[in-house]
Amino acid sequence: MSDIKLYGYATSPYVRKTGCFLYYKQLDFEFVPVSPLNAAETLDFIGGTQVPVLVIDGEARRESSEHALWLDERFPERPLCPSGHREKILRLDKWVSDTFLMSIFRGAIDSEPNLQYRYRFWRLAALVSAHTPMPEQIRHLWPDFVAQAPFIKAMGEKMDLTESPADMAMRIGMELAAHIGEGPYIGGLEQPSMLDLAIFPQLVFGVMFGLEERLSAGQHPVIKAWLSRMAEHLPANPTLVADTMQLMSISDALAALD
């Protein structure tokens, strides 16, 4: 049996993405939480602070989309990027990476720093601290740290910030629904691929862990039906965040939309 470890921040969408690859393939693995306060020390075996880092039998690699291809090489069952659909999947993966996943960081870039904003990032700090405890003062200042992080600023430089956050969210939601189409999975594929597994945990994360009251993406009927299908392929908590921090199940969140 292979020794598999996934290193990352508990709240990183890219870490959740690789985690869902592993869950879908039904591989036993160890999640090693990385503290943002000493990431370089934890990741000294590979250098830098970028996550996720996937280690299989001592070999370490970065880049979540590359993880899908590597996992298929090592563990061909339940493919993430089937050879017959590789070109389509990699083309759509560019949209997932450059548009969908990047948009997750919009709220940290140019949102008004009001109390609602601070509550959101205090909650994220609590989720991080549940795995890698942080001092109370650091948690209190977390909204400010995130807003000033070089990684976040770099994301902002790649976005069209003249488009309002609401318009961006609506546009990307409609694009996702179009990519699902008649389904059953993204791109019209018959089985989930790396595309579905990259997006699903991001859409359910907020409602599961207290960042939104309702599963907002599920208000679109195409996306809601797709979420229900995807949930059948993954554990009840596919996010890597501790179960003790969960406030709502995916099944309850979907039922609340009926």
Language-model features: locations:
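Long, positively charged, glycine-interspersed low-complexity recognition regions
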Residues: 200-258
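Generic alpha-helical structural signal
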Residues: 65, 90, 170-174, 224, ...
